[in-house]
């Protein structure tokens, strides 16, 4: 749908969704998360307007989905027991659980293959070509991998 409005560069990153709970929550596991979270008693925290919100609505239709403004607010809400789990991008979960929210853990990564790319004015083919070349060069020379490692993006 967005491709009607803008052109996109080549993909520079692929991401998936993650199910995050508090470390001391032993009730929800990688084996039973679908059953435990897809019921009327479950509250799932998501970032408003995100792909995680759409994923949660589609995969956990019986749960109460509570949107927050940003990922940090989502994790703060989970730490404050305002929900049973956060659904967010795997890269976001990886970074936040490693840094400021170490009382939270990713219990399940769900493969969704979300591609990240740069939006470009449809008529600007030179810019698109230049961006695609830069993405290729930065990938080939290891810069992308080095940045992902530096910022704990897995």
Residue spans for each PLM region:
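Periplasmic-binding protein-like
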Residues: 14-21, 90, 94-136, 154
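Short helix-loop capping/hinge motifs at secondary-structure junctions, enriched
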Residues: 24-34, 66, 123-130
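Short helix-initiation/N-cap motifs at beta->coil->alpha
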Residues: 31, 66-80, 114
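Short loop->beta-strand "edge-of-pocket" segments that line small-molecule binding or catalytic clefts
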Residues: 32-49
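Hydrophobic residues within well-ordered alpha-helices
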Residues: 37, 77-79, 118, 131
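Ligand-binding clefts/hinges and TM-proximal coupling segments of bilobed small-molecule sensing domains
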Residues: 41, 51-65, 106-108, 130, ...
């Amino acid at each position: 749908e967005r491709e009607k409005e803008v052109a996109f560069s080549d993909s520079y990153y692929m991401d998936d969704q993650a199910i995050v709970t508090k470390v001391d929550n032993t009730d929800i596991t990688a084996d039973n998360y679908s059953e435990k979270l897809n019921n009327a008693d479950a509250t799932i925290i998501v970032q408003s307007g995100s792909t995680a919100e759409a994923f949660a609505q589609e995969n956990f239709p019986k749960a109460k989905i509570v949107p927050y403004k940003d990922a940090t607010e989502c994790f703060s809400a989970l730490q404050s027991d305002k929900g049973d789990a956060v659904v967010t991008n795997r890269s976001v979960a990886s970074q936040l659980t490693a840094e400021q929210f170490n009382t939270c853990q990713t219990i399940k990564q769900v493969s969704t293959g979300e591609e990240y790319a740069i939006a470009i004015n449809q008529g600007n083919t030179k810019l698109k070509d230049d961006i695609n070349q830069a993405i290729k060069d930065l990938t080939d020379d290891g810069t992308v991998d080095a940045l992902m490692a530096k910022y704990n993006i897995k």
